[in-house]
């Protein structure tokens, strides 16, 4: 996936990397096979395991709970047990979807969890599974994107070229977070954790600032026009979440408070526009 790809770059200077995914033939990277991924850990005997695999099809998860549970929780538990036996570190990614998305205040790590959907429920179970390994770093993130593969900006650009009028949701709040940023922060955190094991725990990790999908789309269109891209869209309507009914409920408030992460790892998280503008430069230049 997008984060896994960036991790291969960011983690390279830390040591020898064994990258495993669903299609791997040398080791099992198929998270629908908990025994297989557990065996991979036993065979590789890593010092650090970074798990960027997940069932992220939020709406699909509503109708395939067992499969989502297998990928997001059962296999995580299998890996965590092997990691604990090895004395290895386990780095795992979670989501703001573990919360109910209410209010306007950024969520802190120890706020009450109450997932709105199956995806959130299985990811919460995954956090609890990852914590079976004492040396764990769990990073809750949100609105993840990358220049590589599909993303919201590319979808907006495609629609913006085809349609004169568009409607975009304006009552969900969060911070688009680049896979690059996640991977780089993960590498820093691993370095710190290896020297200071007491930093083990749960952290919120997203870019700084807040936006809505509507404002995010407006930035995409402004940058595209500035780059000379011809867009058909002349009217963009701000609409509520209720205008786009989906099988899975979406949170209104995806803001995460990253104070703990920034203090612990002595890092400053850039504003969300920094990474998004960089990604746009990359995709518009192609």
Predicted regions and their residues:
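N-terminal Rossmann-fold NAD(P) dinucleotide-binding loop
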Residues: 4-5
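Rossmann-fold cofactor-recognition segment
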Residues: 20-35
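NAD(P)H-binding glycine-rich loop region in Rossmannoid oxidoreductase-like domains
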Residues: 31-71
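NAD(P)-cofactor binding segment of oxidoreductase domains
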Residues: 49, 63-91
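Catalytic helix-loop patch of NAD(P)-dependent Rossmann-fold dehydrogenases
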Residues: 70, 74-78, 85, 98-139, ...
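NAD(P)-dependent short-chain dehydrogenase/reductase
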Residues: 128-188
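Mid/C-terminal beta-alpha module of Rossmann-like enzyme folds, strongest
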Residues: 185-186, 192-247
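Amphipathic terminal alpha-helices
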Residues: 272-286
